[in-house]
């Protein structure tokens, strides 16, 4: 049995207002026309209900989490207030990247779809930080990489079409990388985040590893000398990361659990 993609209106309202007393969702006043567009696009999508249902099913918080849209900070998680901040500008910038890169012409997905897919991946990334704090999960290595994996594994394993949504998020990393100069400042080499292009390939690696047959051409950008080795690694890496995160997720076996339906694409345009 699969959870239906478009939830009843009453349930949508309840999820946004109460989030089952586990996640509180707030919208700061949208001050510009563009901010109002972003607010409307987010509110009219299935994104927040999907996020809430995933949390309820797989990573429930002991302490209620607050998600705030708007403002200037973020995307970020503030551990002092147990709050995720997502500015409207993040959605708008993502929308511009997907539009400017002719996403619909190249891949058959609208810029809005790409931007909302990216936003869901980002919400799950920030929720990963929150879950680590909430559950006192030890992290060996870069926490930013760990929560990138958290977000991607949740999409792949627990959402219909989630792998396709993860690919959209990966493409956003590639667009941001293309928009950078050809060099990095020294300080960026000790930044908490991996480089955008690394995040792009790491995300694609997990998607490929989850189903090598379906995504057999996904890593074709990799040079032929490395391709077979990388494909083997990605299959191992997906299983390893998935197994590690399942120690901390509820309903550990995704193959025998319900999937909340996908996509923030079942959205009002």
Regions inferred by a protein language model and the residue ranges of each:
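Sec-dependent signal peptide recognition
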Residues: 2-9
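Sec-exported extracytoplasmic/periplasmic mature domains
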Residues: 52, 56, 60, 128-136, ...
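Pan-zinc metallopeptidase signature
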Residues: 22-24, 185-269
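Post-HExxH zinc-binding segment in Zn-dependent metallohydrolases
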Residues: 142-180
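Active-site metal-coordination segments of metallo-dependent hydrolases
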Residues: 31-40, 134-150
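Hydrophobic h-region of N-terminal signal peptides that target proteins for export
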Residues: 10-19
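Auxiliary, metal-adjacent structural segments of Zn-dependent hydrolase domains
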Residues: 40-102, 106, 112-116
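Active-site recognition of the HExxH zinc-binding catalytic motif
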Residues: 86, 121-134, 144, 148-152
């Amino acid at each position: 049995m699969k959870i239906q993609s478009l939830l009843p209106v009453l349930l949508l309202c309840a999820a946004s207002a109460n989030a089952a007393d586990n996640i509180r969702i707030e919208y700061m006043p949208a001050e510009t026309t563009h901010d109002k567009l972003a607010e409307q696009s987010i509110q009219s999508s299935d994104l927040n209900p999907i996020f809430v249902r995933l949390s309820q099913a797989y990573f429930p918080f002991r302490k209620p989490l607050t998600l705030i849209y708007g403002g200037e900070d973020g995307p970020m998680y503030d551990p002092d207030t147990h709050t995720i901040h997502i500015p409207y500008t993040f959605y708008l910038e993502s929308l511009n990247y997907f539009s400017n890169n002719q996403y619909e012409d190249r891949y058959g997905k609208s810029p809005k779809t790409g931007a909302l897919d990216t936003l869901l991946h980002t919400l799950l990334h920030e929720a990963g930080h929150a879950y680590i704090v909430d559950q006192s999960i030890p992290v060996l290595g870069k926490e930013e990489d760990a929560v990138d994996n958290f977000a991607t594994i949740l999409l792949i394993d627990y959402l219909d079409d989630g792998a396709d949504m993860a690919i959209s998020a990966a493409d956003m990393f590639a667009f941001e990388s293309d928009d950078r100069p050809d060099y990095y400042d020294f300080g960026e080499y000790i930044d908490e985040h991996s480089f955008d292009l690394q995040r792009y390939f790491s995300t694609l690696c997990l998607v490929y590893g989850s189903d090598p047959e379906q995504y057999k051409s996904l890593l074709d950008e990799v040079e032929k000398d490395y391709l077979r080795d990388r494909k083997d690694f990605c299959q191992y890496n997906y299983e390893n990361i998935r197994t590690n995160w399942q120690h901390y997720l509820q309903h550990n076996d995704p193959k025998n659990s319900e999937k909340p339906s996908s996509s923030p694409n079942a959205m009002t345009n």
